[in-house]
Each structure stands twice: as C-alpha cells, then as structure tokens.
Amino acid sequence: LGFGKPLPTAAAITEEGFMSCFSPNTTAAGNRLWCEVSAVVYDGKKLLFANDKDAPAGQSSVFSRNLIQLADTARPTYLMVPPYVAAHKYEDFARTPDGRFVLLTTAFDRVKPGSTDWDGYNTLLYWRTGDEAHPHVLTTDDATSASLGIRQHLASILANDVFPGNMPYFKIEGLAATDDKLFFGVREEGKSYSDFTHRTKIISVSYRIERKGNQERIRLSDDWKLIADFNPARTHPELPRPLALSSLEYDPYHQCFWLLTSLEANGHLDAYLWVIKPEDLYTNKPFTLITNVVGKPLHLGHKAEDLTPLDHQRLLLIHDDDRVQTTIGKRTRQSNQAAYSILSIH
C-alpha cells in the first residue's frame, strides 16, 4: 500500500456552493428543519449523502444526487427502505478501494441498557455499489439487527486507566476501508456526552468477503486495535483548538488516508485537512497538514464533516454547519442547504 509514492501536500478550493437536502422551510414536529449533512460518498456514478438528524415523514436521512446536479435545487432521491429509516445519526461513508462496496456508519454514541430503543444509533450499513436499495447491517453475529457487537469492541479498545474495562461514552465520526481493513475514527470519548475529551483516535479491524450463492457478506475478524492517537496541537500549536477528527477516508488514487479535523466554538467554524501514508498511520506517526498553494495551512471556514475523492485530482468536502448561517461569496446558507467545497489537490 502506497510505498514510495509521493503524498499530495497542497490543495486549492476550486468550487464552493450550497446543496439542497429538502424543500425550503421544511418543518418537523413544528420546528424548522436544518440540513445537517454529515456524510458523503461518490460511488463512481452518483453522490450519496446522509444527514445526522432524522428526516420528516416521506423523506429519508440518506439521499442521492448526480454530481452535475450538486448545486441544483431539485428534490434529491431519498432512500426509503427500512434500514435507512431505522438508523439514526449518520456520520461517515466509506467505499472499498475496488469500488465494490459502500459502507455507512452511525455515531455509536449512545446505548440504553436493557432496551433496544437506541439500537439505531449503533448501526453500520453496507451494500454492493449501485444496489443501495438493499443494504445489510454489519454485525459481529447474525442474531442481531443492529451493530451493537461493534460498539462493545470499540468501547473496550478505548478503555484506559480512568475508565478501565469500557469507555462509557464515545462518538465515531470516521469510517475508512482498505482492501482488508476497516478503520473507525473517534472524535469524542469520556464519561458522557456532556463530559468528554476531543480526540483523533483510529481503531482498525480486518474484514473479509464471504460468498454464499449470489449473496456476499462482509465478515469482521477479531483483531481490533487502537492504531493511532493523533494530537493536532502537538504538531501544529498555531492552529485553533481543540481540533478533533470529523472524517477519515482512504484514497485509492493516491494510496493514502485523508483526515478532516474541525471545531465549532461560539458560532465560529474551522476545519483543516491532513494526509498520511498507510504505513505511517499503522505506526501512529503524525498526519501531515495540507497547505494552500502559498504554503499556509489550508483553512476551511466551515465544520467540514466528510470528504470523498471524485477522481485523481479532486476531493468533494461536505460541511455540517449545524444552524450557523455561513456565507459563500454573497450567498447565505438557508436552513434546507448544506455548504460544499471541491478541492483540487497537488
């Protein structure tokens, strides 16, 4: 993987705009609904998006658009099959390097002991590329309808001296896939959703494809490992803090991993892009900060949430600016819109 290939080091924002998730002024339970897109993937033919908020009746948190219609205001195509509606708080897509499978993870950030009420927050879906109408739930055993076994592995891998046994609270915001491994990116960990530390930690697990007749299933191994614990402030103390992981992707074009880190403080949004070779990630080396063409850190004035390679040259970044009315040029974000950026990489 990627030995000897020079890494991209710089990028330029070549296009920015707003995309629509639903009609303007859409409401749910009497409140105005905001488009809070947290995940994007280009599957080779179209873009798939996922929102980290539930959608109103008749719509879905997961939807698709053609790349050429990215900035179009027309209604997107909603994915309405039950598994998409049953899961909540989507955070990141991944695509296998051979392009055969797409995966989509939730945050794994809450569980209700003795109840199935919150199982939807602990769900990892996958499907054959182009067949998103038939998603499977990735489980550690065939008996469950959610991915709770995955949550248990993540919680025990994150255990430390303060929280031995299991990390009580954590939030997954990154998911990446190589030919034989999945990578989970951790943004938050701690005692609870109101008492946590921002992190950029990465956990790996091996997988294989099992074929039965014309069915293909992803099966996980039992070799869960915490492979990286990156602190952006240590490598770049001049950047705002606390920056934490908001996306992790493997790029088959450059055989590297991309990392997005973001922060939101007092309505002020910042994000930065980083890159690393696989062999450096596996040995917990620091990521390299991507600069602009004049060598300064490439700064995005948004809460960049996910990215996807479009081709050898371009990355598409999607921003979940929560309810902040960010601007692009003279345009201001409306509640049904999410900002995006296309970067050309050098």
Segments from the language model and where they lie:
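Sequence/structural signature of beta-propeller domains
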Residues: 2-346
